[in-house]
Amino acid sequence: MSVRRVVVLGITGSIGAAALKLLRRFPDRFLLVGASGHRQTEYARALAREFSLSDITMTGSCSEQEGRARIKRLLSSCEAEVVVNGIAGAAGLFASLEVLKTRCTLALANKESVVLAASLLHAAARESGATIVPVDSEHAAIFQLIAAHGAHAVAQVVLTASGGPFRTFSKECLAHVTVEDALQHPTWRMGKKISVDSATLANKALEVIEAVQFFRIPVDRVTVVVHPQSIVHALVQCHSGETYAQLSVPDMASPLLYALLYPDAPPAYQTPLDFTSGLSLHFEPPRVDDFPLLRMGFDVARAQRAYPIAFNAANEEAVRAFLQRNIGFLDIAHVTAQALQEDWRAIPQTFEEVMACDTRARMCARTCIAQRWRER
């Protein structure tokens, strides 16, 4: 059994932590040959020593252009078979496209890459013969379910959402949510940005867009349900009437292991669910009136063009402002909605055009944030 050469981008983040857990657990299956991080330089140095790397590429103290150049040099020098892209936010798109210039497998945890530029990703993969395997638990589940039953058999895709820490909060209570409140996710341990996205349901909105664009299915065939236990990660409903689900304990290492070894079957890793212990599963509809970013996600997925880019960029800026305590929790949706009022009907054809739209949307969001700040 051969050892797979692995590069982990974003090794100091939550996806990086999950990848490291697997590399330590299966040293006979994986060899870490390269990695990047954004900050936490001392931690990165310790990881380099642990995994016998000469260096870990760091991007937090340099310009965006230099950071991209460093990622490009890293990828061209490692001869990896699998690259995990755990870079957070729109910054991960450049890395995804660079990975796909090779023939290796892209284990894609950076959902923004698909939201911003799915057509560019698919084209790059076709040209090089590379493979993209999603690492998001929901999309990994859909990927596996479609592989098992065939895309032609699937009538509807159902994404599950935990509902976040404020699932039962009234609109009045949501107005008083603090940064500390928003970072307390009931199920997953994640970085600050994605924790806030989970609290607003923006994360699920991005996953709706990702599902539509990655699997090339109409938005009307995608549904979201709230499932607080986070045990059912996704379901597919077939034309024949059956519904199939993927269930496992909530742990990012499981879909990541699947992607690292694809197309080979992963070894036993998790303890199976015990259905004799009184396990119960609860589902409920999302409260889209109180969490409007989810509805925006469906609208954006339907509109396509540059609207997904604008949605993602404006939300990123709004979340940053919230974490800096410059706007309130409910203002995140307001800022994003305001940015979407601009004209985003152009269809970006290149990475540069995608990033130009991203920049324009961020400027719109910052203008709105400044106005909200003055009104406080």
Swiss-Prot record:
What is catalyzed by this enzyme? 2-C-methyl-D-erythritol 4-phosphate + NADP(+) = 1-deoxy-D-xylulose 5-phosphate + NADPH + H(+)
Q: Which SUPFAM superfamilies match?
A: 1-deoxy-D-xylulose-5-phosphate reductoisomerase, C-terminal domain, Glyceraldehyde-3-phosphate dehydrogenase-like, C-terminal domain, NAD(P)-binding Rossmann-fold domains
Assigned keywords, A-Z: Isoprene biosynthesis, Manganese, Metal-binding, NADP, Oxidoreductase
- The entry marks the following residues as binding Mn(2+), namely 136, 138, 207
- Name the cofactor(s): Mg(2+); Mn(2+)
Pathway given in the UniProt record = Isoprenoid biosynthesis; isopentenyl diphosphate biosynthesis via DXP pathway; isopentenyl diphosphate from 1-deoxy-D-xylulose 5-phosphate: step 1/6
Binding-site positions, 1-deoxy-D-xylulose 5-phosphate: 111, 137-138, 162, 185, 198, 203-204, 207
Question: Record's InterPro entries?
Answer: DXP_reductoisomerase, DXP_reductoisomerase_C, DXP_reductoisomerase_N, DXPR_C, DXPR_C_sf, NAD(P)-bd_dom_sf
Source superkingdom: Bacteria
One GO process term, biological-process aspect:
isopentenyl diphosphate biosynthetic process, methylerythritol 4-phosphate pathway involved in terpenoid biosynthetic process
* Binding locations of NADPH: 12-15, 39-40, 110, 112, 191
> What lineage does UniProt assign to this protein's organism?
Bacteria, Pseudomonadati, Spirochaetota, Spirochaetia, Spirochaetales
Keyword RNA-binding attributed: no
NCBIfam families to which the protein is assigned, alphabetical:
Dxr (TIGR00243)
Stated EC number for the protein is 1.1.1.267
Task: Extract the GO molecular function terms from the UniProt entry.
Answer: 1-deoxy-D-xylulose-5-phosphate reductoisomerase activity; manganese ion binding; NADPH binding
Report the family membership.
Belongs to the DXR family.
Question: What task does this protein carry out?
Answer: Catalyzes the NADPH-dependent rearrangement and reduction of 1-deoxy-D-xylulose-5-phosphate (DXP) to 2-C-methyl-D-erythritol 4-phosphate (MEP).
Enzyme superclass (EC): oxidoreductase
Identify the gene encoding this protein: dxr
Q: What is this protein called?
A: 1-deoxy-D-xylulose 5-phosphate reductoisomerase
